[in-house]
Amino acid sequence: MAIILGIDPGSRVTGYGVIRQVGRQLSYLGSGCIRTKVDDLPSRLKLIYAGVTEIITQFQPDYFAIEQVFMAKNADSALKLGQARGVAIVAAVNQELPVFEYAARQVKQTVVGMGSAEKSQVQHMVRTLLKLPANPQADAADALAIAITHCHVSQNAMQMSESRLNLTRGRLR
């Protein structure tokens, strides 16, 4: 069993999603958004750090998965996003959580089956995979999708390791 915290970083709205993985089964534990309604960036970063720390304390995750920064057309926006990611990662590292990063395209490919999927498609698939009664908010759905991606990637890596181990023992299943 593992608990995974997924984070969709943003300087104004940071989505979070928490799921539990038992074997191949995924279950929803919680999700939401950290909203920073102050204007100055240092205060927003402080709120993101405090919010992520509180979520970690509440859910006690085993793994922390976060979206990688993509190349934005606006350099200022990309820098702010990078800073928001940075404080979220520091919050995880301060709690001694292993940090995993996933590209947005990889997340969409894993959850929807198409790397260019729309936000509404991600929301729908997250709802379906986690058997939720309604679509989660867009930022929370993205965070849940990041957590789901971590489960799939880590499960595939484990299966590959087992296959390699069996090959070194002279057996292939």
UniProtKB/Swiss-Prot annotation:
Q: Which Pfam families match?
A: RuvC
Q: Where is the active site?
A: D8, E67, D139
Query: What is the uppermost EC class here?
Result: hydrolase
UniProt GO BP: DNA recombination; DNA repair
Record: residues binding Mg(2+) 1: D8, D139
The annotation note on the cofactor reads: Binds 2 Mg(2+) ion per subunit.
Q: Sorted alphabetically, which keywords does the UniProt record give?
A: Cytoplasm, DNA damage, DNA recombination, DNA repair, DNA-binding, Endonuclease, Hydrolase, Magnesium, Metal-binding, Nuclease
* InterPro entries in UniProt: RNaseH-like_sf, RNaseH_sf, X-over_junc_endoDNase_Mg_BS, X-over_junc_endoDNase_RuvC
State the family named in the UniProt similarity comment for this chain.
Belongs to the RuvC family.
Q: How does it assemble?
A: Homodimer which binds Holliday junction (HJ) DNA. The HJ becomes 2-fold symmetrical on binding to RuvC with unstacked arms; it has a different conformation from HJ DNA in complex with RuvA. In the full resolvosome a probable DNA-RuvA(4)-RuvB(12)-RuvC(2) complex forms which resolves the HJ.
Q: What is this protein called?
A: Crossover junction endodeoxyribonuclease RuvC
Q: Which organism is it from?
A: Shigella flexneri
